[in-house]
Amino acid sequence: MSRKLDSPIKTQMAVALVKSPLNGEFREFNKVGMKTPVGRRRVFVQTETGCVLGLELDRSDNAHTVKRKLQVALNFPIEESSLTFGDLVLKNDLTAVRSDSPLLLTRNNFHRSSSTPCLSPMRADLQQRRDESSPIEILGNSVSFSFVRQMAKDITKAVKKGIDPVAVNSGLGGAYYFKNSRGESVAIVKPTDEEPYAPNNPKGFVGKALGQPGLKRSVRVGETGYREVAAYLLDKEHFANVPPTALVKITHSIFNVNDGVKASKPMEKMLVSKIASLQQFIPHDYDASEHGTSNFPVSAVHRIGILDIRILNTDRHSGNLLVKKLDGDGMFGQVELVPIDHGLCLPETLEDPYFEWIHWPQASIPFSEDELKYIANLDPLGDCEMLRRELPMVREASLRVLVLCTIFLKEAAANGLCLAEIGEMMTREVRPGDEEPSEIEVVCLEAMSLIGEKDAESPRSDLGNDIEFQFDIDCEEVTDCTKKLALPLGLTFGNARGQLSKVEETTEDGEEEEEEDREEEENDRADLEKMPTIKLSMSLKSTLLGEKSQKYQKHPGARVESAYASSAHRSADEQIPSSTSFVKLSDMSEEEWTIFLEKYQELLYPAIEKRKSITLGQKQRQRLGTSCQF
């Protein structure tokens, strides 16, 4: 039987509601069973080890008072600590924090290990406080969450009747099926502090604090839940069929709390509160890995692919595509695809995506008129404003990735590329021991180089004499070379023989063309040596961007074995398969970002045309056969 939800909280990770008199009138219900008085904000403060505190803030409260309340309630040390709200470090003023927002409290320069326990509330405090909040509170007030609100009410009724959730055994992180009063699974809940490598991961994948690099280095531990919600909010008109998803504070005794001491006797199950993503559970017959793809509707594959392109999904494998039969036989066109697990989308840097559908025949079929119209109507800047409003904790670098990918999708679709071609342009070519930038990353690198040329040619009075335009590329420095990368002035992507343009392989139809290419490469290399150096700071000092034969070294720490099979007793850094970051967007100022976008859009058309010519050449060779040479 489930513990009564109004019982005293006895927990290592509980929401302890700090009591204070409630003055003034109450606002409308904006959560499940919770009211917030006028002039106040309710926020949720989470420590880097997963402890959660629900707080009612007055107008007079500041970052220091929030820390003090957390210290009193959870016995959490606040010396040398930082309170963050997405990218924003809250020094004192809390005006930027909206109601129902999650905040993260981290300790600066605090050495942690996988055995670091979650600091417990004082037992005296536990006896004095009761969790007077609702078992489920939705973080945010979007109208898109109306279905989730009703679902939360159904779950609350079921829990009060003693219908317990069930833990999901598969996967790397903690996940739980919550049920309605009839005992039917209606939602899957994924606590943020039970993600892979998070402090309370129930499957041994621990060793990181919340906010540190996670399974993907560009997606931080504890932030996949935000991305699940972002994917749902970005799926306008339910175009790709993403199930309703919201970020919630949820309380139950089933959740996992790792005991750092590993006591000899099992810990007593206690009510614990977590910040988690809550997504509608979709009954299905199988996933895409358990069935052939030939009967998948073209439109469903296209719609999911369009979403994956926009959000740069780095984890679209067949296991997170649910398949529902719409008739008894499941004949062609009679199945429905439901995409789930979007926690590794919207990375903070341009990552190498994984698109399972890229080689499916449906992806090579041209977009329909309805799909082209949907793509044309996408508004990346409007989408960013929506996410800033609904999920203000999403980091600005992730929003910039959304903008770049959506702009590319719109340009590519308008110029006749199919889904497979678009996906190929975004995907890196990986060879044993090497990782090379994708075609889109090459466009970004060239846009950066053109900005560098502009800075070298024009006076710097606009930006200030002491500002150096700098982009960091997080690649390992593998040689003793320390010379700055020199790029030719006037370099344009339209010239297929330009240094950066040649990062992508061209179609070679004969020996004569190959010989001409080699001669032109030698001439370009000679011209390169004569050009002045541009102040484009890069750590990739050993690499000439203009030559794909120069291999991009893998990020240090990359391993052959998969992190999915690694020993949980090794450090999280050892378990994470590294990925090189060729393009970093977070360091750009707003002015630099605006200029970069202009250059990026200018370079997209010639890059797309080049891809079309490559595809045409491949089709011609397929028709003629590989033995034919002219």
From Swiss-Prot:
Q: Name one GO molecular function term.
A: 1-phosphatidylinositol 4-kinase activity
Q: Where is the Ubiquitin-like domain?
A: 41-98
Disordered: where is this region? 500-527
Q: Which domain of life is it from?
A: Eukaryota
The record's top EC class is transferase
From the UniProt record, give one GO term of the biological process aspect: cellular response to hypoxia
**SUPFAM superfamilies, per this entry?**
Ubiquitin-like
Give the span(s) annotated as Catalytic loop. Answer: 312-320
Q: Report biased composition (Acidic residues) as residue ranges.
A: 506-524
Which cysteines pair up through disulfides? They are none
- CDD domains linked: Ubl_ubiquitin_like (cd17039)
Sequence ranges assigned to domain PI3K/PI4K catalytic in this UniProt record: 162-459
Q: Per the record, which residues fall in region G-loop?
A: 168-174
Annotated positions binding ATP:
N169, S170, G171, L172, G173, G174, A175, K190, Q279, Q280, F281, I282, D341
Assembly and partners are described as: Interacts with AHK2.
Question: What is this protein's function per UniProt?
Answer: The phosphorylation of phosphatidylinositol (PI) to PI4P is the first committed step in the generation of phosphatidylinositol 4,5-bisphosphate (PIP2), a precursor of the second messenger inositol 1,4,5-trisphosphate (InsP3).
What is this protein identified as?
Phosphatidylinositol 4-kinase gamma 5
Q: Organism source for this protein?
A: Arabidopsis thaliana
